[in-house]
């Protein structure tokens, strides 16, 4: 396995560990999710370029679209929670309160 794949995989693991460690604040969780999506995007792009399979070139773009949607929804949720409660703790996101 080339070292670039190991580095990208380690970046994904570190972002996942950051998500598990800093899960109390919503902003930290969103940044870790973006790091995970970025490492997945690079990994899928490198794999598609190395495989020379024409149909696999659309997978990184689809992942990028989903990452942009996730970021937009996450930032909207962050603005809503910070305006309502004045802080960005994840514990304020109780979905049972409606």
Curated annotation (Swiss-Prot):
Main enzyme class: translocase
EC number per UniProt: 7.1.1.2
Membrane topology summary: Multi-pass membrane protein
Record-annotated membrane-spanning stretches: 1-21, 29-49, 61-81
InterPro entries: NADH_UbQ_OxRdtase_chain4L/K, NUOK/Mnh_C1-like
Alphabetical GO biological process terms: ATP synthesis coupled electron transport
Keyword Translocase: yes
Subcellular location: Mitochondrion inner membrane
GO molecular function, one term: NADH dehydrogenase (ubiquinone) activity
Catalytic activity: a ubiquinone + NADH + 5 H(+)(in) = a ubiquinol + NAD(+) + 4 H(+)(out)
Domain of life: Eukaryota
Any one GO CC term of the record: respiratory chain complex I
Keyword Nucleotide-binding (UniProt): no
The entry's keywords: Electron transport, Membrane, Mitochondrion, Mitochondrion inner membrane, NAD, Respiratory chain, Translocase, Transmembrane, Transmembrane helix, Transport, Ubiquinone
Chief localization: mitochondrion
Function: Core subunit of the mitochondrial membrane respiratory chain NADH dehydrogenase (Complex I) which catalyzes electron transfer from NADH through the respiratory chain, using ubiquinone as an electron acceptor. Part of the enzyme membrane arm which is embedded in the lipid bilayer and involved in proton translocation.
Protein family per UniProt: Belongs to the complex I subunit 4L family.
Record note on quaternary structure: Core subunit of respiratory chain NADH dehydrogenase (Complex I) which is composed of 45 different subunits.
Record protein name field: NADH-ubiquinone oxidoreductase chain 4L
Annotated organism of origin: Lepus europaeus
Gene: MT-ND4L
